[in-house]
Structures are given as structure tokens and as C-alpha cells.
Amino acid sequence: MAPAALRAQDDGSLYNGWGVGFQVGVGGMLPTGSLSDDLKGCALFTGGLNAEVNRLRFKADVAYGQPSFKNNNPYHVLDDTGRDLQLNATANPTLLGVGLQAGYTVWRQGKVSVTPMVGVNWSRLSWDLNHIKYEKDDEDKERPVIDDVTGTHESGFAFMASVDVDIKLHGKLVDYPLGGDRQAHYTSSLRISPFVTHAKFDNFNPSVKGCCIGLTVSYAGLLRAIR
């Protein structure tokens, strides 16, 4: 293909109006507000799919992490004397998040593009609880004993926002995956995405809420059909 045509590909003039792709990466998040009273931040592993129509971007991704508890009895279950009747059996609960976002590429220059995104995030925090009872030992002193272990979770939907900063790594022509004589252009990028999402746990005692702020760094691939 002629150099002029390759330059036209870089500015999008030879592409069809749509593209599909994926991203996979790592990152981290920190809770703010009263969320930080009960939870610490954690590393995140992320992956997902993208669809683009001209400058519009639609993104669905999944994030996995294991934050740490600061509060060993977040439901604050006590007996009449103030002793714990529940304690976390899991120091690091499992955090699963599923995000759906839409955005628009507001700036594209050379190898760099910037796309603000907004959407919703469903998250689930799950862990095990020890149920405690108190029994007298041989010295007639009451000691805590684990009576039962059960699983529990907190989940919900919340607003989220992010900004995708894509730095193009390379591009190449490939065969069109749906067959025929057409070709497609595959572009790989380094994607840096700061994000914020709201979260609250009404069942905790006291209830906690705040935002989780974080950053992910991903490899992103995008396939566009050529006119």
C-alpha cells in the first residue's frame, strides 16, 4: 500500500466506521471516605472488550482484586456484654467488578488519543464469617470458640467514570476475519486509565460509603475493517 494510503489509515480516513477490540491489564485501587475505615486498597487484574463507531467507544470490562479488611467485625454483631459474636474468617475478601461504559474520543494527535468514559459498575465483595460462641474451659474461664463458618457478600450498582489514554504501539494489515478479499487494520496500544467509582455498604454497622479511585495499565488491541 502506498505511503499516502498508510498515512490516511493513521488518521482514520480509510477505516470503516466501526472497530472491535479487547484490553487486558493490571492496576490498583484505593477506597476513600468511610469506606477506608473498613477496607484497604488492592491490586487489580482487568480484562474486557471494546467496540468503536467513529469516535464513540463502548467498553465492557471485568476487574478482580483482594482488598484487606481493617474492621474484623463490619456488621458489629455483639452479645449483651459487648463481645464479638462474628469475626471475619477471611482477611482478604474477593472483589469482583463488572463495568459498562461509553465514551467519546475528544483528542487524537499522532500516536496518542484521549477518551473520557462514563457508565455503571456492578461490584461484589465476598468473604467468610466466623460465628463465635463462648464456652468455659477447664479453669472456668470463658473463651471464644468458632461455632460455625458461613459465606456472605455485599453487592450493588454504582456510577463510574474513567479516562482512556491510548498510546499507539504499532499497526499492521491483516486478513479480514469474516473472509472475502478485504483487509483489516490491527492496532495495538498501551492504555492508561485512571478511574473513579462510587460504592456503599448499607448493611455494615455503621454503614460506609465513598469512592474507589484507581489506575489500570492495559494492552489494548483494535481491529478495523478498511474500506
Predicted features, each with a name:
Residues 7-58, 220-227:
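Short glycine/proline- and aromatic-enriched beta-strand/turn motifs that initiate or cap beta-hairpins
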Residues 16-20, 39-45, 56, 92-98, ...:
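Residues that define the transmembrane beta-barrel architecture of outer-membrane proteins
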Residues 22-26, 58-62, 100, 114-118, ...:
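Membrane-embedded beta-strand positions of outer-membrane beta-barrel proteins
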Residues 26-32, 53-55, 62-68, 120-126, ...:
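Transmembrane beta-strands of outer-membrane beta-barrel pores
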Residues 30-36, 46, 81-90, 145-153, ...:
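Extracellular loop and loop/strand-boundary signature of outer-membrane beta-barrel proteins
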Residues 33-39, 70-79, 127-136, 175-179, ...:
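Outer-membrane beta-barrel translocator domains and adjoining extracellular loop/strand segments
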Residues 53-142, 155-159:
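Gram-negative (and chloroplast) outer-membrane scaffold detector with strong preference
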Residues 164-227:
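Predominantly the C-terminal beta-signal and adjacent terminal strand-loop region
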